[in-house]
Amino acid sequence: MEDADGLSFDFEGGLDSGPVQNTASVPVAPPENSSSAAVNVAPTYDHSSATVAGAGRGRSFRQTVCRHWLRGLCMKGDACGFLHQFDKARMPICRFFRLYGECREQDCVYKHTNEDIKECNMYKLGFCPNGPDCRYRHAKLPGPPPPVEEVLQKIQQLTTYNYGTNRLYQARNVAPQLQDRPQGQVPMQGQPQESGNLQQQQQQQPQQSQHQVSQTLIPNPADQTNRTSHPLPQGVNRYFVVKSNNRENFELSVQQGVWATQRSNEAKLNEAFDSVENVILIFSVNRTRHFQGCAKMTSRIGGYIGGGNWKHEHGTAQYGRNFSVKWLKLCELSFHKTRNLRNPYNENLPVKISRDCQELEPSVGEQLASLLYLEPDSELMAISIAAEAKREEEKAKGVNPESRAENPDIVPFEDNEEEEEEEDESEEEEESMAGGPQGRGRGRGIMWPPQMPLGRGIRPMPGMGGFPLGVMGPGDAFPYGPGGYNGMPDPFGMGPRPFGPYGPRFGGDFRGPVPGMMFPGRPPQQFPHGGYGMMGGGRGPHMGGMGNAPRGGRPMYYPPATSSARPGPSNRKTPERSDERGVSGDQQNQDASHDMEQFEVGNSLRNEESESEDEDEAPRRSRHGEGKKRR
């Protein structure tokens, strides 16, 4: 297909029509004029062969026929790195012949010789990891195989000196020298001299590289030894894995040289301290997946040793008494590096799965400690050594660092226990003062309605459900009003409210500073006994009366702080209080029952302070109990 301007868009139209020639480009169909073809083809062939072949310096990089082009599947065209011509001399090697040494296909067009395959260098050295699948030729050498040391030495030489003996590296070094000289003045005598210089440079470079490799592979023994960490003590050792709940306690132990474990583990460590020369503690902080170091136990547990303001986690057992330790090694050893170590003393589980003060089998503990010494020191090692030197200096000066007077921040364990007991007692007192129905927290929160029993005779109207619990107590949770037991002020100066937040709910819900102030013209007396309240016929719920004004400094709907159980029989007979009233016992019981039906909830919604202030409240409840029994 040709355009009007003579442009051809048939890219591979002349692939099979042109003559076969040893060019890298795709052959183009010759024009119709044979004379012009004879003139143009020969220079084109010579030019391509000269440029591609590099003027006789080597074969073209397109020296192998493209396998995909033979099957008509190559889509790269001129960009393909293989030859798109059928040339038997440049055919690729048959894969079956390369893998199995034979090819059973009669019409196979590929090569069946190993001459053009490059020799495998790894196989020449003695071992090829690719085996029979290697793309290079495996030529067996005569004689016995070389020793392993010689093979390793040759491999090291290849990896070390490959950069110095690389042809590209040599060409880069020689190219600037050749470019500096004129093209026509390159003498033939200079070539041996340059080659000799190159050989000398190549000999010097391997020596230098060998010296550098020896320095890197064989580190200085002085640098290899840890100057800061202390070696493991000689003798009989017992090893224990110690768990720390947090990193703060671990760093505090590094600074002060003490540790404290749970009281259940103290006997175990004391027994080990008395039985062997050295007790080695290998520490691991929880949730770090690392071992942080090891220390030697230097004192029994039981004597007073100052220091260690340990941080307790919520819900964990408290620590026991302090004991001194000497830090030997501080580092970061990953659990992954200890995955092959298992502890026979712990059901043969990995050492990373250990409880606090879990003893390790001596050989396993020694291996774990040796792994710690292979890791570099952490920053805490220098801190530990500095703190230890400071303690030694203070001992030399006669200063006792464990003195309580000189260390006011350090509190002994027994004093800690006493303070904690006092705090618990004070918290219990505050909770008892706060009252149960105010919720779990301290202070005036939202008050939950108590499950109070209804007064005697309280029944809902016919056809209605029972009264919900939310209306029988402080369910409004209105945050304002008079201050409570803790003296909370009235933020808006509202004073006591006559009703709840949404008006009166029941017949006895009128409680205000002035009776009837919300309903002018109504009598200030209470609702008649057994009359119609706001709930209709029958007895209304006795939630107090209109004349029952709230008391200052007390919440209006405060629930009772005591249980609703009746008082004991000791309060039933109170002759002193009955004499004060000047009436008989029967009259007192009748008055008490009548008063309690009207003031039952109002009296029950008072706390223990009101009971202690007013002497008339307790006898009413006790006598009301007798009245019920006599009825």
Curated annotation (Swiss-Prot):
Compositional bias annotation for Acidic residues: 412-432
**Record localization:** Nucleus; Cytoplasm
Q: Does the keyword Cell wall biogenesis/degradation apply?
A: no
Q: Where is the composition biased (Basic and acidic residues)?
A: 392-407, 573-583
Show the CDD domains listed in the entry: YTH
Biased composition annotated in UniProt, kind: Polar residues:
216-231
Q: What are the boundaries of the region Disordered?
A: 12-38, 179-234, 392-447, 541-631
Q: Name one GO biological process term.
A: positive regulation of plant-type hypersensitive response
The annotated modulation of its activity is: Endonuclease activity is repressed by the N-terminal domain of FIPS5. Nuclease activity is inhibited by zinc (>100 uM), cadmium in a progressive manner (50 percent activity at 1 mM Cd(2+)), and high salt levels (e.g. KCl or NaCl >600 mM). Stimulated by ATP in the presence of Zn(2+), even at inhibitory zinc concentrations. Elevated temperatures prevent RNA-binding at 55 degrees Celsius, but endonuclease activity at 70 degrees Celsius. The sulfhydryl reagent dithiothreitol (DTT) inhibits both RNA-binding and nuclease activities.
- Among the Pfam families in the record, one is YTH
Instruction: Recite the UniProt keywords alphabetically.
Output: Apoptosis, Cytoplasm, DNA-binding, Endonuclease, Hydrolase, Hypersensitive response, Metal-binding, mRNA processing, Nuclease, Nucleus, Phosphoprotein, Plant defense, Repeat, RNA-binding, Zinc, Zinc-finger
Limits of the YTH domain: 237-372
GO terms of molecular function: calmodulin binding; DNA binding; endonuclease activity; mRNA binding; RNA binding; RNA endonuclease activity; zinc ion binding
Q: Which GO terms describe its cellular component?
A: cytoplasm; mRNA cleavage and polyadenylation specificity factor complex; nucleus
Residue ranges with Basic residues bias? 621-631
Q: State its role.
A: Component of the cleavage and polyadenylation specificity factor (CPSF) complex that play a key role in pre-mRNA 3'-end formation. May interact with poly(A) polymerase and other factors to bring about cleavage and poly(A) addition. Mediates poly(A) site selection. Binds RNA in a calcium-dependent manner. Exhibits endonuclease activity with an ability to nick and degrade linear as well as circular single-stranded RNA that leaves RNA 3' ends with hydroxyl groups, thus mediating processing of the pre-mRNA as a prelude to the polyadenylation.
**What do we know about how this protein assembles, alone or with others?**
Component of the cleavage and polyadenylation specificity factor (CPSF) complex. Can form homodimers. Binds to calmodulin. Forms a complex with cleavage and polyadenylation specificity factor (CPSF) subunits CPSF73-I, CPSF73-II, CPSF100, CPSF160, CFIS2, FIPS3, FIPS5, PAPS2, PAPS3, CLPS3, PCFS1, PCFS4, CSTF50 and CSTF77.
**What protein am I looking at?**
30-kDa cleavage and polyadenylation specificity factor 30
What organism does this protein naturally occur in? Answer: Arabidopsis thaliana
